Amino acid sequence: MAKATVKTDKQEEKQRQRELQRRADLIRQRTASRRRRFRLGGGAAAVLLLVGAVAVAVRGYGSTTPTSAVAASLGAPTGATPPTPTGQFHKVGSVLRQGGKAEFVFFGALYCPHCAAERWAIVKSLSQFGRFAHMSSTTNGQGVPTFDLTHATYQSKYLSFVARDMEDQNGNALQALSADQRLLFSQYDPSGGIPLVAVGGYAMSGSPILPDEISGRPFNAVQSALKHNAGDTFVQDINAEANELTALICHADGMQPQAACGRPVIRHLVASVR
């Protein structure tokens, strides 16, 4: 009886892996198609300051499950680090600033699986510098649980946050970019890939967090795993990316606050940022 159970478990695992691979193939095809929509051309003009205030108030596609305590429930920061000091980020220019504060930019779309995965790290990192409100949890069209920031606000003494989801779950136009934002997008990411994350003079197109790692899991399960620093690969990946984002923010804002920027892992990462 035990042997039969083992065999069944193996069969189920193989079936699960095949399904994940099928989803990954579909995601790659859909993302490749979507990216063509965001090719906005090159641009050599100087980067202009983005429109926005201390809080980013965005509106758009409705989502589910109001989660006012979500940001504070992703667990304490850990010592996880990316494979390289600056992760997948590359130097793009001077530090973006808004109202005298370092500016953090996220351009994505609600259908985008890598955007969904990256939001976990963004929320965990930025919660160390300020406070989110009016967030929701939702599930991406490919089954990836994530945060919906389209109604969110963010307040911080140290950081300005700009988040724009350009299309909804069905690929319909959602949040249009301003002229300055389109210029920044074309300069930092000429290929038009999403998500685009920019902070501290560095930018990244894509995400090192594999969406398949959390696809099909309930939002609360991912949240709980992060809160308890479980041994799952996605927990390590999200925590490492959160630390990378934190280091870039600390580099840009003069290493404040000490609670976020004074940790040894962050000081080590900041030392590698030019």
Predicted regions located by residue number:
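An acidic-aromatic
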Residues: 122-126
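Conserved redox-active cysteine motifs that mediate thiol-disulfide chemistry
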Residues: 109-120
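Non-globular targeting/processing and membrane-anchoring segments
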Residues: 1-103, 117, 127, 131-274
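Short glycine-rich or small-residue beta-strand-to-loop segments that form or flank ligand, phosphate
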Residues: 103-109
